[in-house]
Amino acid sequence: LIMLAAVLGYAFVDGYTKFLLLAAVQGACFGLATTAGITVAIDITTSARRSAGNMVYAWAARLGMLVGVVLGIGMYRMYGFRMVTYLSVAAGLASIFFASRVYVAFRAPIGVSLCNMDRFLLPRAWVPAINMLLIAFVPGALLPLMFVGDYWSLAALAVLVFITVSFMKMFVKLSHHCQRGTANTTCHLSMEAGLLVGMTVACHLMDKAQIYHVASVAAMLAVFFFVLLTYPYYKKKQVR
C-alpha cells in the first residue's frame, strides 16, 4: 500500500526532489515485495519442485516487466503520464488481491538476528551477479532512446528476459538447499542495478551515438566476462 501511495504521488508531485523521494520509497517497497514474493513462491511448492517454482516466478517477473514497459510507453503517448500512474496503481491493487488469495502456513522464524542480509545477497554468486549487471546495463542504456523514437531497447529487453532465466538457473545451482530464495533475489537485484546504472549513464551522456558506443562496449565486456570468468566459476562452484 505504501508503494502504491508513492506511485500515485507521481501524478501530483511538483518538484524533482519530491519525485526522487517518491521513487526511493517505491524502490524500497518494491525490493521488499519482490523478496517476499520469492519467499512465498518457494514456501508454497514442494521441496522437489522448488527450483521449478523459482523458474516460474522468474519468468513471470521478467515478462511482467517487459509488458509493463510496452504498455507504459503506449499509454504515455496516448493518454499522458497521469494515466500511466493510474494504470500502475490499478495493477498494484490487482496484485494485492491475488496475493491475498495465496495461503501460506505460518512458520515461526528460528534464530533470526536483528539485521542480516541473507535474504538479499548470495556471496557465492558474486561473479554471475557482476555479469548480470553488465548484461542488464545494455537495455538500461538503450531505454531512454525510446523517447526519441528508437525502439531497439525493446529487443534488448526481450533478450534480457531469456538470458535472465538462464542466469537464474545458474544462481540457484550455486546456492545451497536453504538459499534458493536468496539466489533469486540476488539475480533480481543485480539485473535491476544494471538497468538503473544503464539509464543513469544514458541520461548523463545525452548523445545517441555515445550511448550506442557505451552499450556495445558493455555487451562485449559481458560476453568476455561470461566466457572467461562466470562460466568457469559456475562449473567449479555449483552444488547441484
Regions found by a protein language model. Name each.
Residues W126-V127, N131, A136-F147:
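Helix-loop boundary and gating motifs at the non-cytosolic
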Residues L22-A60:
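Cytoplasmic helix-loop-helix junction between adjacent transmembrane helices
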Residues R77-A90, H204-A222:
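A membrane-interface helix-boundary motif in multi-pass transporters
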Residues D150-F167:
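C-terminal transmembrane helical hairpin of 12-TM major facilitator-type secondary transporters
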Residues V89-A108, F225-Y233:
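C-terminal membrane-cytosol helix-exit motif in multi-pass small-molecule transporters
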Residues L32-T45, F162-H176:
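Intracellular juxtamembrane helix-capping segments at the cytosolic ends
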Residues I2-D14:
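C-terminal ends and interior cores of transmembrane alpha-helices
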Residues Y103-M132:
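Juxtamembrane intracellular "pre-TM" segments in multi-pass secondary transporters
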